[in-house]
C-alpha cells in the first residue's frame, strides 16, 4: 500500500495523466475525488499548510484570476492564515481544474 494521496479531478487531463503515471510506476495511491468529497475548511488549511508551509503562493496558478484579487504575485510569499478567509468566502463558483498530490 502506498502512502501517496491524490486529490483527483477525473475531468482534468493533467490529473488523469498524473494518476496514470503513479499507476505506471507501481503506486496505488489513495484517490480522493475532491469534487465529490471536498475537504472541510480545516482539512484544506492543514493540507495546504503541510504541503506548502509558508509558500501558499505556490499552490495558486500564476494565471489564476485570484492573483490580482488577493494582491499576490509569484515572487511574494503569503501565510495561509492571511488569505484563507477570502478563498473560503469567495462568492463566485470556482471550478477546480487540477488535482494535486500529497506524499506522506
UniProtKB/Swiss-Prot annotation:
Q: What is its EC number?
A: 1.20.4.1
Q: Tell me the superkingdom of the source.
A: Bacteria
GO terms (BP aspect):
response to arsenic-containing substance
Q: Name one GO molecular function term.
A: arsenate reductase (glutaredoxin) activity
Gene3D superfamilies (alphabetical) = Glutaredoxin
What SUPFAM superfamilies does the record tag this protein with? Thioredoxin-like (SSF52833)
Entry-linked PROSITE patterns: ARSC
Keyword Electron transport, does the record have it? no
Question: Which reaction(s) does the protein catalyse, per the Swiss-Prot or TrEMBL entry?
Answer: [glutaredoxin]-dithiol + arsenate + glutathione + H(+) = glutathionyl-S-S-[glutaredoxin] + arsenite + H2O
Catalytic machinery residues: 12
Q: What does this protein do?
A: Reduction of arsenate [As(V)] to arsenite [As(III)]. This protein expands the substrate specificity of ArsAB pump which can extrude arsenite and antimonite to allow for arsenate pumping and resistance.
Q: What else is known?
A: Is missing about 40 C-terminal residues compared to paralogs.
What protein does this entry describe?
A: Putative arsenate reductase
Lineage, opening ranks: Bacteria, Pseudomonadati, Pseudomonadota, Gammaproteobacteria, Enterobacterales
Amino acid at each position: 500500500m502506498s502512502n501517496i494521496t491524490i486529490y483527483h479531478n477525473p475531468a482534468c487531463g493533467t490529473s488523469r495523466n498524473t494518476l496514470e503515471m503513479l499507476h505506471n510506476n507501481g503506486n496505488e495511491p489513495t484517490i480522493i475525488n475532491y469534487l465529490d468529497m471536498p475537504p472541510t475548511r480545516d482539512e484544506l488549511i492543514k493540507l495546504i499548510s503541510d504541503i506548502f508551509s509558508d509558500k501558499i503562493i505556490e499552490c495558486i496558478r500564476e494565471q489564476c484570476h485570484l492573483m490580482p484579487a488577493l494582491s499576490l504575485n509569484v515572487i511574494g510569499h503569503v501565510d495561509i492564515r492571511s488569505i484563507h478567509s477570502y478563498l473560503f468566502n469567495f462568492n463566485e463558483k470556482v471550478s477546480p481544474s487540477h488535482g494535486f498530490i500529497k506524499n506522506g
